[in-house]
Amino acid sequence: MPKGDGKLVAQNKKARHDYAIEETFEAGIVLQGTEIKSVRNARVNLKDSYARIDKGEIFLHNMHISPYEQGNRYNHDPLRTRKLLLHKKQISRLIGETKESGYSIVPLKMYIKDGYAKVLIGVARGKKKYDKRQDLKQKEAKRDIERAFKERQQ
């Protein structure tokens, strides 16, 4: 999570709805040329993205970074596979956790921290339909309670 002066660039709200997040990790991301300029302009979409482990390295797939407007021919493929930067211990831990069936790695947030682009990834287990319904009911009940409490104070 961004501590202090981390500027939030993109957030994957759908991930918290579709998955139960077990654990989170902060990872750096390898970007090329004009991609960082698009990231700083918050032209990023994490909606359908996911991370995969390949030969001891973690790669982020299907993350859309829009081409930079003034980048002309130097722009890169918007859906290019990007490498995530983590410590070896963290990678081995992620490998162990994702070997269990039902677990996957999803990006939750992207932000700029101390001038570097960071991605908050989470080890997640998919929610069933009834879990999603239950979460929505709890959220709605909490909202109703807060609304009633606010009306009493006025």
Curated annotation (Swiss-Prot):
GO MF terms, alphabetically ordered: RNA binding
Gene Ontology cellular component terms for the protein in this record: cytosol
Subcellular localization(s) per the UniProt record: Cytoplasm
Keyword terms: Cytoplasm, RNA-binding
Keyword Kinase: no
UniProt cross-references to Pfam families, sorted A to Z: SmpB
Signal peptide: none
Gene3D superfamilies per the UniProt record, alphabetical: 2.40.280.10
Basic and acidic residues composition bias: residue spans: 132-154
PROSITE patterns in UniProt: SSRP (PS01317)
Entry annotated with the keyword Repressor: no
Superkingdom to which the source organism belongs: Bacteria
Main location: cytoplasm
Any Gene Ontology biological process: trans-translation
Disordered: region residues: 131-154
Job of this protein: Required for rescue of stalled ribosomes mediated by trans-translation. Binds to transfer-messenger RNA (tmRNA), required for stable association of tmRNA with ribosomes. tmRNA and SmpB together mimic tRNA shape, replacing the anticodon stem-loop with SmpB. tmRNA is encoded by the ssrA gene; the 2 termini fold to resemble tRNA(Ala) and it encodes a 'tag peptide', a short internal open reading frame. During trans-translation Ala-aminoacylated tmRNA acts like a tRNA, entering the A-site of stalled ribosomes, displacing the stalled mRNA.
HAMAP family: SmpB (MF_00023)
Recorded family membership: Belongs to the SmpB family.
Protein name listed in UniProt: SsrA-binding protein
